[in-house]
């Protein structure tokens, strides 16, 4: 139960990163636009007072502000996409659900535009709809609901007369219904929840602010190895605290308030839950990297210099710290605990110095300049002396403990592992193999710094191999693996997903189970599209176009072109003279190659891999030659209909160079064994 919960929390944390990733672009526009309009920068650069420059600056500020003003909707869309595996249909469903929920709540509570003008009312105008203000939490709730609707109904089958609405088209319809129903309990209970949040944040921030900022920095840092820090900081950044802007609107959340105060040029009061990162990320951790380099064995210093130099520069410029932190987290957990304490003390120190700094992405030099130095609204220069003190503390504490306790930090290992050289195109294949192959992957995801994989069997994961491939660390919690590859993690995940989906086939062909049950048959380079190949019906039943198959791997022709048959009898016969190329271990899929070189995959039913061979009887074996009409497989049609998603059977030409299929009987209607199904050219 605990492991499953951790996996779910990981996915939620990663999903929150998608909308958060938009904020740096918005912050860049807003910060530069605001700085150009400010007197401080105009004093040094008088030419920017030009009317044209000022108009552009105003447009930049407005363009950046609109993102922050619509964060709840952006979170709804982003969370839906993140939790639905990146499918855009979930985002459409989230948008539909978001506007329906807000419109229904507004009408149910009889909210008028006049009510919205009262900041204390708890109402707001969202996309022009007077409604209850649910903030970012409301967006997250809708996003999660949209993802649930997608995962539940994306492959639903409906009667033929409602076939147009089957599959993904059904998701927004279902979301419209569920969000309408959700609006009523939200309208009744959310005001109480919001009052509770306000009371909690007021007590936390006003009564015990020093303790609160220390604990925030300390706990957030401790959660980073588990990837759960995004969940922890979200309410502090987007909900806790309140401030009234010049227009009379109530703004919630430390980051939202900070950005709004920067935009208006107001006196800064926000930033308490962000500013402590700057001394640590710009000074402390780079100094720790220097200590790790100095304590490395002489023969390893050249390699360590490259690793630590890159990680330190990444931390300094962007505030991305995981590549550096994971280099000592597992071998020296005491150092990481001290690092977390120092992080909390950094928040407390800047709070006591009355410094107010914020960021849109992380506490690196780029955000420091854009949102600290250029606006010049706080004592930003105090970060430098605090940071220098932190650099000294980090360097000597790390160096002393590494030597005293003989920690095996990078460059101090008893025996250096042999790094594996893998090109950019080979790396995703190598990582996939190190994870135990695609049959071992239950769920694949990534965030900015880490590859997140839920595996079926942890014993099949080659942890040292992942480190040799460039992972600075590998975290294991139950069957959830996190490999720290830094900023390239998301690209590795994307390419691994393509390989698993059969979109990239460069290595020897595998026939393994994955999330989409993708089965890839290696393409025979000798096959040529100049030949004509006749394929006869291997089943008796009703012909259906691939586009109507409720599985996007087949319907979007990721594996190749073809057709599907909804069987009326439980037999599969050879569609041509040829040879059995492969048989899937669970007997639900079979690959053949014809005497003329055409390669064909017959996939009996959808999601039938989960039946583990139950209901299937084989009559052939791999490598066996067959004649057209020979019996290949018997299957229990009733059992499949009762235990699988569908009995519909895709018949796929797996050669990408063969796309011209002539369907002699058409793509609809009944067909029998031996009838000509199509001609491939």
Swiss-Prot record:
Residues 551-655 form the PTS EIIA type-1 domain. GO terms for cellular component: plasma membrane. Keywords: Cell membrane, Kinase, Membrane, Phosphotransferase system, Sugar transport, Transferase, Transmembrane, Transmembrane helix, Transport. It catalyses: N(pros)-phospho-L-histidyl-[protein] + D-glucose(out) = D-glucose 6-phosphate(in) + L-histidyl-[protein]. The chain crosses the membrane at residues 16-36, 73-93, 126-146, 170-190, 199-219, 273-293, 303-323, 328-348, 355-375, 383-403. Signal peptide: none annotated. This is PTS system glucose-specific EIICBA component. It comes from Staphylococcus aureus (strain JH9). The gene is ptsG.
């Amino acid at each position: 139960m605990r492991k499953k919960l951790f996996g779910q929390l990981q996915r939620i944390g990663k999903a929150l990163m998608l909308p958060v990733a938009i904020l740096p672009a918005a912050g860049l526009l807003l910060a530069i636009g605001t700085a150009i309009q400010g007197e401080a920068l105009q004093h040094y650069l008088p030419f920017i007072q030009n009317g044209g420059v000022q108009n552009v600056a105003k447009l930049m500020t407005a363009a950046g502000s609109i993102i922050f003003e619509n964060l709840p909707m952006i979170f709804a869309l982003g969370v839906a996409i993140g939790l639905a595996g990146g499918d855009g249909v979930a985002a459409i469903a989230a948008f539909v659900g978001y506007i329906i929920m807000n419109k229904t709540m507004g009408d149910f509570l009889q909210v008028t535009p006049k009510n919205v003008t009262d900041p204390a009312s708890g109402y707001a105008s969202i996309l022009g709809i007077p409604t209850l203000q649910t903030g970012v939490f409301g967006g997250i709730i809708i996003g999660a609901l949209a993802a649930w609707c997608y995962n539940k109904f994306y492959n639903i089958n409906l009667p033929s007369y409602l076939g147009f609405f089957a599959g993904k088209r059904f998701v927004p319809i279902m979301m419209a219904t569920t969000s309408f129903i959700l609006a009523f309990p939200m309208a009744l209970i959310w005001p109480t929840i919001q009052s509770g949040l306000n009371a909690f944040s007021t007590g936390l921030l006003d009564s015990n602010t020093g303790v609160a900022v220390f604990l925030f920095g300390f706990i957030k840092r401790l959660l980073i190895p588990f990837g759960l820090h995004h969940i922890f900081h979200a309410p502090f950044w987007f909900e806790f605290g309140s401030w009234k802007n010049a227009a009379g609107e109530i703004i919630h959340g430390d980051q939202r308030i900070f950005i709004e105060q920067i935009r208006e040029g107001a006196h800064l009061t926000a930033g308490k839950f962000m500013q402590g990162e700057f001394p640590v990320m710009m000074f402390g951790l780079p100094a720790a990297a220097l200590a790790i380099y100095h304590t490395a064995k002489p023969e390893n210093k050249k390699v360590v210099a490259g690793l630590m130099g890159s990680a330190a520069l990444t931390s300094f410029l962007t505030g991305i710290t995981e590549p550096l932190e994971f280099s000592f987290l597992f071998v020296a957990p005491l150092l990481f605990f001290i690092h977390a304490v120092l992080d909390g003390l950094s928040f407390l120190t800047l709070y006591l110095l009355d410094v107010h700094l914020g960021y849109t992405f992380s506490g690196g030099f780029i955000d420091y300049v854009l949102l600290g130095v250029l606006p010049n609204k706080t004592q930003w220069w105090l970060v430098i002396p605090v940071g220098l003190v932190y650099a000294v503390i980090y360097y000597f504490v790390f160096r002393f403990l590494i030597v005293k306790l003989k920690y095996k930090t990078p460059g101090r290992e008893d025996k250096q592992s042999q790094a594996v050289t893998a090109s950019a195109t080979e790396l995703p294949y190598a990582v996939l193999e190190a994870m135990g192959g695609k049959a071992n992957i239950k769920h694949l995801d990534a965030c900015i710094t880490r590859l997140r994989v839920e595996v079926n069997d942890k014993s099949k994961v080659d942890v040292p191999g992942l480190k040799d491939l460039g992972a600075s660390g590998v975290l294991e919690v139950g069957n959830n693996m996190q490999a720290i590859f830094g900023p390239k993690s998301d690209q590795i995940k994307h390419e691994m997903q393509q390989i698993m989906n059969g979109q990239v086939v460069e290595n020897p062909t595998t026939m393994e189970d994955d999330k989409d049950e993708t089965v890839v048959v290696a393409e025979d380079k000798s096959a040529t599209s100049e030949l004509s190949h006749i394929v006869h019906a291997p089943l008796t039943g009703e012909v259906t176009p691939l586009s109507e198959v409720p599985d996007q791997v087949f319907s979007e022709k990721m594996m190749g072109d073809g057709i599907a048959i909804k069987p009326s009898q439980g037999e599969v016969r050879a569609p041509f003279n040829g040879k059995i190329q492969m048989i899937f271990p669970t007997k639900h899929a079979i690959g053949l190659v014809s005497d003329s070189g055409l390669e064909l995959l017959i996939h009996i039913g959808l999601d039938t891999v989960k039946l583990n061979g139950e209901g299937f009887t084989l009559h052939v074996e791999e490598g066996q030659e067959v004649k057209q009409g020979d019996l290949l497989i018997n299957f229990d049609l009733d059992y499949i209909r009762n235990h699988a998603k569908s009995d519909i059977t895709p018949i796929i030409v797996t050669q990408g160079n063969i796309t011209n299929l002539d369907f002699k009987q058409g793509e609809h209607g009944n067909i029998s064994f031996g009838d000509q199904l199509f001609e491939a050219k």
